[in-house]
């Protein structure tokens, strides 16, 4: 029995801007994302019976049809008339409900893995089309790397630049639901983020410009709910981080550091402050 293992890296937002609200009630976002080497692992194995089985080592994860990984398998089986079943094992390292795209990355890894397992020979465009049907972050996660994202997550422009940085992550012991953040957005008063300046800094390998322009338009809303997020940011900067920023809708905060020594100082400053602290690198 042949199994396929795919790595599912987490992502952080170097920039997140809200452009406005669409007629359908959703918001147009513009983001810059980059993958980090904190990863889940997705293992898919064939089953003779026509079933979809999901296992996970994380008790917080649903292992039924509510899981995006299940939705991916069901959609691919239906779209490409696959009659055999599949077992999907999720080894979780990325915190859940953390704004780091763990669920989306797992779904993307499942698309890539099933493409191999069932020899579908899907193009990148075809895999992205499946991802769009699952969730807005999934198309980016299929390619991963460093990219500018627009629209519903389907406009992906890979950035020709290399950010080699240490990243310290802090996941507070509470979650923030993205669905509850967006109704509070007032596009007339939120802090805007210059996404073009971030892209230019990355393409020009200008680290100083990058940290100057990084920002997250959702930060003020999430911090108003959970002031602890600001305390984490302040603590990281005080310990020597070049910049500290919330990723996604939170609550996870990350710090960028150019040296491992610097990252160790930041890591040690927050290690006793929160239970979930990670020191990783950009991919």
Curated annotation (Swiss-Prot):
InterPro entries: GHMP_kinase_C_dom, GHMP_kinase_C_sf, GHMP_kinase_N_dom, IspE, Ribosomal_Su5_D2-typ_SF, Ribsml_uS5_D2-typ_fold_subgr. One of its GO terms (molecular function) is 4-(cytidine 5'-diphospho)-2-C-methyl-D-erythritol kinase activity. Coiled coil: none annotated. Its EC number is 2.7.1.148. Keywords: ATP-binding, Kinase, Nucleotide-binding, Transferase. It is an enzyme of class 2 (transferase). It comes from the Bacteria. The keyword rRNA-binding does not apply. GO terms for biological process: terpenoid biosynthetic process. The keyword Nucleotidyltransferase does not apply. The active site is at 11, 137. ATP binds at residues 95-105. It catalyses: 4-CDP-2-C-methyl-D-erythritol + ATP = 4-CDP-2-C-methyl-D-erythritol 2-phosphate + ADP + H(+). Belongs to the GHMP kinase family. IspE subfamily. NCBIfam families: ispE. PANTHER family: 4-DIPHOSPHOCYTIDYL-2-C-METHYL-D-ERYTHRITOL KINASE, CHLOROPLASTIC. Catalyzes the phosphorylation of the position 2 hydroxy group of 4-diphosphocytidyl-2C-methyl-D-erythritol. HAMAP family: IspE. This is Putative 4-diphosphocytidyl-2-C-methyl-D-erythritol kinase. It comes from Streptococcus uberis (strain ATCC BAA-854 / 0140J). The gene is ispE.
């Amino acid at each position: 029995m042949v199994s396929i293992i795919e790595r599912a890296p987490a992502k952080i937002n170097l920039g997140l801007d809200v452009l406005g609200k669409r007629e359908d009630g959703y918001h147009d976002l513009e983001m810059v994302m980059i993958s980090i080497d904190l990863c889940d692992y997705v293992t898919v194995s064939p089953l003779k019976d026509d079933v979809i089985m999901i296992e996970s080592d994380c008790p917080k994860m649903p292992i039924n049809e509510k899981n995006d990984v299940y939705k991916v398998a069901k959609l691919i089986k239906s779209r490409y008339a696959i009659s055999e079943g599949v077992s999907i094992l999720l080894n979780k390292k990325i915190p859940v409900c953390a704004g780091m795209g763990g669920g989306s990355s797992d779904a993307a890894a499942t698309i890539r893995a099933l493409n191999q397992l069932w020899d579908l020979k899907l193009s990148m465009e075809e895999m992205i089309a499946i991802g769009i049907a699952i969730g807005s972050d999934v198309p980016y996660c299929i390619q991963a790397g460093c990219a500018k994202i627009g629209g519903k997550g389907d406009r992906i422009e890979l950035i020709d630049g290399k950010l080699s940085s240490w990243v310290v992550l802090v996941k507070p012991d509470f979650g923030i639901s993205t669905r509850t953040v967006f109704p509070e957005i007032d596009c007339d008063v939120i802090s805007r983020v210059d996404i073009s300046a971030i892209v230019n800094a990355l393409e020009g390998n200008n680290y100083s410009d990058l940290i100057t322009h990084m920002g997250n338009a959702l930060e003020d809303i999430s911090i108003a709910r959970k002031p602890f997020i600001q305390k984490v940011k302040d603590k990281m900067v005080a310990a020597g981080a070049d910049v500290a920023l919330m990723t996604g809708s939170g609550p996870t905060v990350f710090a960028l550091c150019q040296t491992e020594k610097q990252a160790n100082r930041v890591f040690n400053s927050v290690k006793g402050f929160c239970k979930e602290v990670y020191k990783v690198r950009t991919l």
